[in-house]
Amino acid sequence: MNGRVFQFEWDEVKANANVRKHSVSFELARTVFNDPQLLTVADLEHSENEERWFSIGYATNGSILSVVYLWSDADPAVTKIRLISARNAWQTEIRYYQEGL
């Protein structure tokens, strides 16, 4: 995502619930943003009250994760990313990622 500095944040209760539900920590999920092939699209289906984004990429443990988040680039030097959900990517998502769709 264009060489900017990322600042990550999340709700700890939500982060703990995400580990219980999907077995993926937000600490691991944040590493997908280092993937130069990161696939990102607007999450229009879940963007009723806020603009959500959906990315698929490799995490540092070698797994391909799907991550939902909000982001703000109000500061031109820093992109703030608020993680909402993270899980192992589904097979169809992995195929999209591999095909660069």
Q: What kind of region is each of these model predictions?
A:
Residues 1-101:
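Ribonuclease/tRNase effector modules and their secretory precursors
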